[in-house]
Amino acid sequence: MVSRVILNLQLVCANTQGIPANNKIKLWIKKIFFSSKKKIELTIRIVDIQEMLYLNWYYLGKKYPTNVLSFPFEPPSEIQTSLLGDIVICKQIIEYENRKNNIFSDVHWAHMIIHGSLHLLGYDHICDEDAELMNAMELNIIRTLGYKTCCFL
């Protein structure tokens, strides 16, 4: 079980209404990293669409915003750290997807945090086989959080 979770939650969007509470997000993080025996440290940055548009363009060369981006921290081999990296979530995209797909807000927020966390751990969805594994892991974690299903799974 995770001995300690250090969550740096950065709310840098104009309107923070509808964002899950810090303690709820921390609970989700603890469930995601339940089997880890070490201290976990990560940043979750919740941004407006303009920042996400810039980040997606700057780092991935894509000219549109996305719902979540992950930036794993890869320290030099001689440095020991509990820092996993950063997850950036776009509030407006999450809200749009909630309305479009008639999704309960907390489930979608949890899903994006799970998705971003799995990327920090090295999982991806580039090929179909990896996408299936990642989707199965996401659904399993969603269920451990007490939700029956998830938006895109």
Curated annotation (Swiss-Prot):
GO terms for molecular function: metalloendopeptidase activity; RNA endonuclease activity; zinc ion binding. Zn(2+) binds at residues 115, 119, 125. GO terms for cellular component: cytoplasm. Its EC number is 3.1.-.-. It holds the Pfam family YbeY. One of its GO terms (biological process) is rRNA processing. It comes from the Bacteria. Coiled coil: none annotated. It is found in: Cytoplasm. The keyword DNA-binding does not apply. Belongs to the endoribonuclease YbeY family. Single strand-specific metallo-endoribonuclease involved in late-stage 70S ribosome quality control and in maturation of the 3' terminus of the 16S rRNA. This is Endoribonuclease YbeY. The lineage of its organism: Bacteria, Pseudomonadati, Pseudomonadota, Gammaproteobacteria, Enterobacterales.
